[in-house]
């Protein structure tokens, strides 16, 4: 995998996108390009610059949410939360945003997933577990199991399953094959079980 080339393509897409009007669609594309650049740099071992790009992605996901007025675009707070977690940053503001938007009570499983991530970021593990058990229908069971786990062994088993399912996939956001969910869950585990 040529991570340098993937980074350069993503950075070029981001720079090109900044020259356009920043409507909702363009803001999502900017966020996705920043996400790809950050993950590519992470794979190159450049954690500092990866963090810059991942924080940029989180900011653009929030801007696109604010521009959209769509109360069910849950991928945006999820993207922001995961980007900040992987960057090693405090994701508390993004977590409060997701919860204030109603993620934990959302009708869709993906919305409730955003809520569970947000609750875990804020250290509200018991509440997160209660919401996580509602994800069963229409949601990847390995991710739901990891989110609901209250001990490190069960969590580790579930995250290993997430990694395994990642290896079986053939499509990835921005064509960047990085196990972002597992990386974010690893960060949460380091906070929950140590």
Model region roles, listed by residue range:
Residues 144-194:
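Long, ordered, amphipathic alpha-helical scaffolds
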Residues 1-165:
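Eukaryote-skewed repeat-based solenoidal scaffolds used as protein-protein interaction platforms
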């Amino acid at each position: 995998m040529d991570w340098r080339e993937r980074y350069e393509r993503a950075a070029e897409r981001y720079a090109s996108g900044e020259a356009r009007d920043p409507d909702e669609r363009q803001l999502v594309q900017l966020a996705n390009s920043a996400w790809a650049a950050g993950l590519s740099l992470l794979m190159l071992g450049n954690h500092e610059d990866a963090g810059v790009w991942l924080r940029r992605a989180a900011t653009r996901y929030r801007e696109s949410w604010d521009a959209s007025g769509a109360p069910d675009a849950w991928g945006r707070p999820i993207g922001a939360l995961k980007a900040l977690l992987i960057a090693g940053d405090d994701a508390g503001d993004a977590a409060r945003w997701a919860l204030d938007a109603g993620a934990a009570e959302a009708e869709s499983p993906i919305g409730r997933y955003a809520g569970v991530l947000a609750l875990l970021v804020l250290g509200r593990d018991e509440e997160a577990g209660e919401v996580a058990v509602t994800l069963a229908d229409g949601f990847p069971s390995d991710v739901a199991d990891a989110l609901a786990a209250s001990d490190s062994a069960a969590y580790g088993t579930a995250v290993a399953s997430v990694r395994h399912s990642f290896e079986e996939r053939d499509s990835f956001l921005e064509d960047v094959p990085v196990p972002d969910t597992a990386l974010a869950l690893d960060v949460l585990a380091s906070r929950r079980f140590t």
